[in-house]
Amino acid sequence: MKKQSFSVKDLINAGLFSLLVFAAMFVGGIIGFIPIFMPFIPFICALCSGPVFMLYSTKIHRFGMVLIMGTIIGLLFMVTGHGIYVLPGTMLLALIGEYILKKGNYESLNHTRWCFTVYSLASGFMMIPIYITRDAYIQRLIDQGYGQAYADKMMSVLPNWTFLPVLLLGAIGGYLGATLGIKMLQKHFKKLGMA
């Protein structure tokens, strides 16, 4: 059996859509400027990026395309100050998503939706520093000019017990975002024989 390698087009698509998914997540994350909305950032990020991922899924025909995206996005979040845990977490969830897509032979909308749902747990990983380095995170917020009142309000809505619910909100946002993407792209998926 001949091993399929990535074409230049595959790599360009992976890079381009990684940046588009990251941009959609970044737009969703803007609600974080209002500290009481911080627990909902993973939900909004996944909801906003779901349609972009579903469009990307039409370009995925081999194992590794989601892993490339997860690696690029994890690196981008890591270098923008979201901690070191976001990269391995994003890569692990992207790898699990790869197996879900493969099980659906890269043609099943339902498998694609579940791939993105699982992957969207990663949108909560960018918040890990809030939970494990609280004091340092508060000081960083103050140093960046957000002020003590903003930091105190953020921490009041993100006590340690909220980590798992925040992760689950990311998955719910991913499921709904992928579903929204399916609805928006229904004609496109039918043309490709995926719907």
Predicted stretch roles:
Residues 1-29, 142-146, 150, 154-159, ...:
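Membrane topogenic helices and adjacent juxtamembrane segments
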Residues 2-68:
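Hydrophobic transmembrane alpha-helices
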Residues 11-16, 43-44, 64-71, 87-88, ...:
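Hydrophobic alpha-helical transmembrane segments
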Residues 18-26, 72-80, 119-128:
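Aromatic-anchored segments of alpha-helical transmembrane domains
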Residues 30-38, 72-101:
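Interfacial aromatic-anchored transmembrane helix boundaries in multi-pass membrane proteins
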